[in-house]
Amino acid sequence: MKKTAIAIAVALAGFATVAQAAPKDNTWYAGGKLGWSQYHDTGFYGNGYQNNNGATHESQLGAGAFGGYQVNPYLAFEGGYDWLGRMPYKGDQVNGAFKSQGVQLTAKLSYPIYDDLDIYTRLGGMVWRADAKNNVVGGDRRSNHDTGVSPVFAGGVEYAWTPSIATRLEYQWINNIGDAGTVGTRPDNGMLSVGVSYRFGQDEAAPVVAPAPAPAPQVQTKHFTLKSDVLFNFNKSTLKPEGQQALDQLYTQLSNLDPKDGAVVVLGYTDRIGSDAYNQRLSQQRAQSVVDYLVSKGIPAGKITAQGQGESNPVTGNTCDNVKKRAALIDCLAPDRRVEIEVKGVKDVVTQPQA
């Protein structure tokens, strides 16, 4: 039976990685519980008490009442009273009973699994009173009591049916209740219980809903990529007629975007053929040619800039590494020769009024 109780405690502790159907912050709650209470290590060995020669009923009904203060969703302080049960032992030579009760104070640590379901653990202490009777047929009759303090460990799950009503399933463990020098034994107690609690101050008037603020303007970014072979002849930075046609179409798209506070960046790229310095200069010249043309179409000169990137950021990767002939290599590297245009701006979000 002791192994069963420990297994339940371990299972509940395993859940305790997450926990919370907690009341509102800074509110009070109260409740009661009822369950199965079992004493462990119940042998008598002190103060003249004798062990039973018959059945010992270690499992009994346990009950309690509790109240607490919820500090925040994860922490509460809880106090309560527990009746841990009366354990009778019956034999034809020795009989009697052991019972205990106590007042406890614990910190309750919770964590939410779902909106209405928490896992929690309670840690603290109990001030207990233990009473024992021991009757030996034809011999001594003893009756003593003892008081003391023991640690309390508990874990469980709690579900909120409504904001004000919650239930909990809990396993609680208390070490060393009693003193063998007084009541003849010093058992431990484990109690598996079901509890119900009422949370005070959970209901409130529905808040007045303020009008939703106007949506924040959206920052938009658009990217366009044009092949340099369409815009320019190889190794040249002067726009071809078909390149101008391509930029005319691009200008129409840019005009349709119409962002506020817009800015356009034109990035020129080359392939890897040639020196770094030459490719950097050529990419800058090509980007500037595109900028000049778009400015001539109507884009404000202060809103558009040219940046030469040289042979950086090739899109072909290593696909052309084994191409040896120059003409074939030029064709293979064509995707690297490109002009990218990036448009950034703020666009107001228009919302429809509610019906």
Swiss-Prot record:
This protein's GO CC annotations: cell outer membrane; pore complex
Gene that produces this protein: ompA
Bilayer disposition of the protein: Multi-pass membrane protein
PANTHER family, alphabetized: LIPOPROTEIN YIAD-RELATED, STATOR ELEMENT OF FLAGELLAR MOTOR COMPLEX
Subunit structure: Monomer and homodimer.
Keywords per UniProt: Cell outer membrane, Disulfide bond, Ion transport, Membrane, Porin, Repeat, Signal, Transmembrane, Transmembrane beta strand, Transport
Residue(s) at site: Part of salt bridge gating mechanism: E78, R168
Keyword check for Repeat: yes
Annotated family: Belongs to the outer membrane OOP (TC 1.B.6) superfamily. OmpA family.
GO BP terms, alphabetized: monoatomic ion transmembrane transport
Annotated stretches, region: 4 X 2 AA tandem repeats of A-P: 210-217
Pfam families: OmpA (PF00691), OmpA_membrane (PF01389)
UniProt cross-references to NCBIfam families, sorted A to Z: PRK10808.1
Mapped Sequence repeat ranges: 210-211, 212-213, 214-215, 216-217
Bridged cysteine pairs (disulfide): C320-C332
This protein's record includes keyword Secreted: no
Source organism: Shimwellia blattae (strain ATCC 29907 / DSM 4481 / JCM 1650 / NBRC 105725 / CDC 9005-74) (Escherichia blattae)
GO MF terms held by the record: porin activity
Signal peptide positions (record): 1-21
Protein purpose: With TolR probably plays a role in maintaining the position of the peptidoglycan cell wall in the periplasm. Acts as a porin with low permeability that allows slow penetration of small solutes; an internal gate slows down solute passage.
Protein name listed in UniProt: Outer membrane protein A
InterPro entries: Bact_OuterMem_StrucFunc, OMP/PagP_b-brl, OMP_bac, OmpA, OmpA-like, OMPA-like_CS, OmpA-like_sf, OmpA-like_TM_dom
Record remark on domains: The extracellular loops are most variable in sequence, and in some bacteria confer sensitivity to phage and/or colicins.
